[in-house]
Amino acid sequence: MWRVARSAASTFRRTRRLSTAISAPCIVHKRGADILHDPWFNKDTGFPMTERDRLGLRGLLPPRVISFEQQYDRFMESFRSLEKNTEGQPDSVVSLAKWRILNRLHDRNETLYYRVLIDNIKDFAPIIYTPTVGLVCQNYSGLFRRPRGMYFSAKDKGEMMSMIFNWPSTQVDMIVLTDGSRILGLGDLGVQGIGIPIGKLDMYVAAAGINPQRVLPVMLDVGTNNQKLLEDPLYLGLRQPRLEGEEYLSIVDEFVEAVHARWPKAVVQFEDFQAKWAFETLDRYRKKFCMFNDDIQGTAGVALAGLLGTVRAQGRPLTDFANQKIVVVGAGSAGLGVLKMALQAVSRMTGPSADPHFFLLDKNGLITKDRKDIDPAALPFAKAHHEIEGLGLQEGAGLAEVVKKVKPHVLLGLSGVGGIFHEEVLRAMKESDSVRPAIFAMSNPTNNAECCPVDAFKLAGEDIVFASGSPFANVDLGNGKIGHVNQANNMYLFPGIGLGALLSGARNISDTMLEAAAECLASYMSDDEINRGILYPSIDDIRDITAEVGAAVLRAAVAEDLAEGHGDVGVKELQHMSKEETIEHVRQNMWYPVYGPLVHE
């Protein structure tokens, strides 16, 4: 069975260096129809005749052997036909139809699925990841056909240490975990949030080359406060209100301990937890396990890379970042994470007495120290009265007023409120103190974006730098000019963070490792690209980006003495690698989908 299958790659390592590039055989414990029903090993009609005999498949498949390339072309033809047949239909209908055809392939043949995904990442990432994954989560109970990942619920308390051994793979490198409490900008989706870990891990495989047999999407179901779901007869999760307080934390504790007991070297990514639990769990586990929270730390890294890019676009040295006036709208885990990492960057530039020009707003307006019952996580970024009285601002000031009076260099949205950067706000950005103001509308999915790029370029000026969380087309400004739309999405960082942490064998993921990832991404773009307003690379280059980010994270782990090595590569070998050798080492450890020979044991 695939659950105990193992690769003979290590046995063949030296041989492969001296011979032709033949994939190492994989030893399996299945035969016949069981192989055909296993998406990891199934090759459909691609099994050669010798393998059909070896695995008891002769007669179970049509006699013609179809090559991998022919299978690939056949799927792409079907996909293009679907695109043609759904022309003119609502976007949601088309998106779900595309997701279904990809999901059917994923359920049947993972090797072909990931090759299709890697080769067409620009077209398919928006389907298996943001923004379509949000639509999938909203409809998950109705779309459910085949389980993927593991589900731990409040009813499993006391059983998780044994449950973890129900997962069939003996080795897991990467886990993405959610409790479904804050899915994108869609709120509490309960168990239906499992679509997020699945989509994230698809990106880990496609971008970071994590072996798909070693990934595990996890849903931690502690109930839901979404009344619509509780009343839905098709809802697949627990029909109870969410656990809170120590009851909640005891469930998360038990799961984390179970994972660490079975796979102590696995990297765990926390995803889409509501803000209070996102910060609580990050503080609780980050020094004990190799884990990170993508909403807090991944989003922050991508945003910081873009913010540093805007300084370059203004023709200023990076040290001038300390003088940038930044208005952040959204005081959840993502917005606070961005400010925390930005503050760390300013402190490195100016010293511990840094006095950043950050202004934070939530649904109640500008956050100041005069606010009652202020969130402790927001307190470091709350403005004192003397800091804003000269601007004519006070507690609770609205967004338009803040932008008009602060005249920020950067307006950054992580509010989850679509259209909050309305006409008055965008026109006010035209009066920014910056020669090239930046607008980051980073909320996902598309409908939750704070503004669309067309409005931003029209109302705030053609010289702005623009970035969004979801993909948008570039804007035709006329006269041959293009308004470049950057996708400031975590996919540029989290695969590299996870890969670098894994290959270094890091005991935990430090702020320095995360900052190394952000700075690597920030330096990836050329001066010419930055001058044209292009802050982030093309997603077509995602594997190259991830290799460089992963290498930067690995080097940072080694420098901080957090690395313990991975596989047969120890810490001493990692220490002696040059920058170029580290990048090559990372590339060599990225899985790529090909049909390898299967040997039954």
UniProtKB/Swiss-Prot annotation:
> What protein name is recorded for this chain?
NAD-dependent malic enzyme 59 kDa isoform, mitochondrial
Q: Which residues bind a divalent metal cation?
A: 271-272, 295
Arranged from A to Z, the UniProt key words for this protein are: Metal-binding, Mitochondrion, NAD, Oxidoreductase, Transit peptide
Subunit organization: Heterodimer of two related subunits.
User: Which SMART domains would you find in this protein's record?
Assistant: malic, Malic_M
Chain ranges passing through the membrane:
none
Instruction: Give a Gene Ontology cellular component term annotated to this protein.
Output: mitochondrial matrix
Family designation: Belongs to the malic enzymes family.
- Which catalysed reactions does the entry list for this protein? (S)-malate + NAD(+) = pyruvate + CO2 + NADH
Biological classification of the source: Eukaryota, Viridiplantae, Streptophyta, Embryophyta, Tracheophyta
Which GO MF terms are attached to this record?
Answer: malate dehydrogenase (decarboxylating) (NAD+) activity; metal ion binding; NAD binding
Q: Per the entry, what span does the transit peptide take up? A: 1-18
InterPro entries tied to this protein:
Aminoacid_DH-like_N_sf (IPR046346), Malic_enzyme_CS (IPR015884), Malic_N_dom (IPR012301), Malic_N_dom_sf (IPR037062), Malic_NAD-bd (IPR012302), Malic_OxRdtase (IPR001891), NAD(P)-bd_dom_sf (IPR036291)
- Give the residues the record marks as binding NAD(+): 182, 295, 444
Residues the UniProt record annotates as site (Important for activity)? 295
Please give the cofactor(s) recorded in the UniProt entry for this protein.
Answer: Mg(2+); Mn(2+)
Q: Where is the active site?
A: 129 (proton donor), 200 (proton acceptor)
Query: Which CDD domains does the entry mention?
Result: NAD_bind_1_malic_enz
Q: Per its UniProt entry, which superkingdom is the organism in?
A: Eukaryota
